[in-house]
């Protein structure tokens, strides 16, 4: 019986989706623009990296050709040198969102058919009755923010007032999110989580996809900094996912990174949530090495998105891509005959783009394992094709959406 490892490189899009113009994202291209910036010397940072984008292992798996399929061009430095060693293609999202739950749920076989609720880019951004209910139920002295904002910018602007008043910082973005930032010591980490649990209930009637706890530390004098104790409070998928199918079949499942949060901890098996891409990949490889036949490891690597995409940090994003690429031999080494590894993304977050939000993009589809014959997969009309293919590989019944390759 086979095993499978599904790796989501959070926000590593490869070119604007066919409907990107509806989102103001026509022309966005996370990987392509990073490669172009690095080739032009705009990806250099002393002590971090310099020169063209170097991803020899992903290039050998067909990443550059997947980019070409999505945009019509191979990004600088990503043309394969020799035969491609994987199945390669690109996928288009059918869900209306460009957010984390929409992308992951569709990958797992459940496209979001109804639109998420969003808050307007006004101040206040939140309905008065929502704010009043949260303040009353959580016993808060009030809230700060109540607007669209960059998470790092708003804690710098309001962190000192938050510590002084005890009012948490509440903000949103173009995604369907209600985010609450609070100081781990002055406000308390567990109190922040409990406030978010209440906010989750308060936000449900508004079809908000995620409530996110954004803890931070520091002071006005030394500056404030986010910690690794972020926690997402998501709604559950509206139908059975690949994970539910695995649970029903009695298969071993390991969820690494924020996968458990994304799927509201339903059918997510053993959850491991280290801090940072490197530690998450370590945990996934360790879990996969001991995984029984028929098992599944689902990994999200979020630092591309949170540390570099939203911060429009080209050198940091490039270095993160190169660091992952350097570890591909470790991934290949843990695969046994019959195993499948799929590498993809959930949306884009072009660090050369305007603003600080996600970008509506196509995503790479790279699949490999001992004994798999490399070939072009072309354009996949739904992210759900990946979940369908993993289900077929593991001998599960077909999912509700997607076509296996």
Swiss-Prot record:
Record's keyword annotation contains Manganese: yes
InterPro entries assigned: Alkaline_phosphatase_core_sf, DeoB, Metalloenzyme, Phosphopentomutase_DeoB_cap_sf
Pfam families: Metalloenzyme
Gene3D superfamilies with a match to the protein in the record: Alkaline Phosphatase, subunit A (3.40.720.10), Phosphopentomutase (3.30.70.1250)
EC numbers: 5.4.2.7
GO molecular function annotations of the record: magnesium ion binding; manganese ion binding; phosphopentomutase activity
Keyword line: Cytoplasm, Isomerase, Manganese, Metal-binding
Residues holding Mn(2+) 1: 10, 346-347
Coiled-coil annotated residue ranges, if any: none
Source species, domain of life: Bacteria
Substrates-to-products reaction catalysed: 2-deoxy-alpha-D-ribose 1-phosphate = 2-deoxy-D-ribose 5-phosphate; alpha-D-ribose 1-phosphate = D-ribose 5-phosphate
Cofactor note as given: Binds 2 manganese ions.
Gene Ontology cellular component list: cytosol
Principal cellular location given in the protein's record: cytoplasm
Pathway assignment: Carbohydrate degradation; 2-deoxy-D-ribose 1-phosphate degradation; D-glyceraldehyde 3-phosphate and acetaldehyde from 2-deoxy-alpha-D-ribose 1-phosphate: step 1/2
GO biological process: 2-deoxyribose 1-phosphate catabolic process; 5-phosphoribose 1-diphosphate biosynthetic process; metabolic compound salvage; nucleotide metabolic process
Entry-linked HAMAP family: Phosphopentomut (MF_00740)
Family the entry assigns: Belongs to the phosphopentomutase family.
Role, per record: Isomerase that catalyzes the conversion of deoxy-ribose 1-phosphate (dRib-1-P) and ribose 1-phosphate (Rib-1-P) to deoxy-ribose 5-phosphate (dRib-5-P) and ribose 5-phosphate (Rib-5-P), respectively.
Protein name per its UniProtKB record: Phosphopentomutase
